């Protein structure tokens, strides 16, 4: 093929146009709703790890794709799971520790850039000061203000925007932010999220936990939390409880640390008292993420809690309807 023909072929290819979630919905039959599932994007901690990214979870339900927390590395896992930033419709944050929200910027900017004004604004929910954080990131005078201005005003960026299906004048990224507190209930198309209290690092950060209920089942996520009656009440009777499991019981640095983060024996009691069907352990430190230690923790939990216990892994997908677990991609090493 001559170089001129090759260039003409590249210029005419539609590959630069990114299908959006709205396109997918329009093309799909009305009954083609996604069954409720949750994918563990990041099951690690703030500590560096090549195996476990920081906190992030992806829920598929109906026509919506919801992320709960989006820490460093979570967005990479989202792409590995077969999803795109433009697929995400809602983002919820339990608290604003960096290991739970650092990829928020990547999600918003990549979704805005690839979506080319053809996707609805991202719905964002989180504790204060999520609104101020959003403005400081994406506002005119925000951290990414000069980047956003360049992508809106430079001719080359405008050309790329139009190639992706956009129509000038390009809008700024404008996440629709709602600050939430304990007791809030957010309703979607066939789902409802209830906001509960998490016991972690108050009063310096407001810390929340979430529960989603649908006709197919229920999932509760503690965020970061030590042992508290609030989690027992929020998780009552749910199909899946995803709980922080930071330490082996007795190895916490201090009593204060235990109250903020808990341990595996605390989690066993919470799961039992809440009457959940499945307990998923996450936010796992390297000191316990080892052969024999993992098995010992699961065994000791099962001495108290008689439901299913799952050692969470990045890219593990769970469906509460049948308690089925599948790995999207096996962890290396």
Protein language model features and the residues they cover:
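A polyampholytic, Gly/Pro-enriched intrinsically disordered region
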Residues: 327-333
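Cap/insert and terminal regions of metallo-dependent hydrolase folds
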Residues: 207-209, 215-220, 225-316
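Twin-arginine (Tat) signal peptide motif
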Residues: 1-7
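Intrinsically disordered, low-complexity regulatory regions of eukaryotic regulatory proteins
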Residues: 3, 21-22
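Binuclear metal-dependent hydrolase catalytic cores
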Residues: 7, 11-14, 23-219, 298-325
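N-terminal signal peptide c-region/cleavage motif recognized by signal peptidases
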Residues: 17-19
């Amino acid at each position: 093929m001559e170089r001129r023909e090759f260039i003409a072929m590249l210029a005419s290819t539609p590959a630069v146009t990114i299908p959006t979630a709205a396109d997918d919905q329009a093309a799909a039959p009305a009954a083609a709703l996604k069954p409720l599932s949750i994918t563990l994007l990041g099951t690690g901690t703030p500590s560096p790890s090549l195996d476990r990214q920081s906190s992030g979870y992806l829920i598929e339900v109906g026509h919506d794709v919801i992320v709960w927390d989006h820490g460093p590395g979570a967005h990479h896992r989202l792409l590995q799971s077969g999803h795109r930033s433009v697929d995400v419709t809602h983002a919820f944050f339990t608290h604003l520790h960096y290991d739970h929200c650092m990829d928020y910027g990547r999600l918003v900017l990549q979704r805005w850039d690839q979506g080319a004004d053809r996707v609805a604004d991202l719905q964002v929910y989180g504790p204060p000061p999520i609104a101020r954080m959003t403005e400081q990131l994406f506002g005119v005078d925000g951290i990414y203000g000069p980047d956003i201005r360049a992508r809106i005003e430079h001719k080359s960026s405008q050309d790329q925007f139009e190639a992706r299906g956009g129509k000038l004048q390009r809008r700024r990224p404008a996440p629709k932010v709602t600050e939430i507190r304990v007791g809030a209930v957010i309703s979607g198309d066939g789902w409802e999220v209830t906001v509960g209290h998490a016991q972690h690092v108050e009063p310096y950060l407001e810390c929340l936990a979430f529960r989603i209920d649908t006709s197919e089942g229920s999932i509760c996520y503690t965020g970061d939390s030590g042992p508290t009656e609030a989690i027992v009440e929020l998780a009552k009777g749910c199909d899946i409880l995803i709980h922080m499991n930071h330490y082996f019981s007795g190895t916490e640095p201090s009593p204060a640390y235990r109250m903020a983060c808990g341990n595996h024996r605390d989690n066993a009691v919470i799961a039992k008292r809440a009457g959940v069907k499945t307990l998923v352990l996450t936010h796992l430190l390297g000191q316990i993420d080892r052969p024999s230690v993992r098995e010992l923790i699961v065994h000791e939990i099962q001495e108290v809690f008689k439901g299913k216990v799952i050692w969470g892994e990045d890219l593990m997908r769970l469906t509460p309807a049948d308690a089925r677990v599948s790995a999207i991609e096996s962890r290396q090493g």
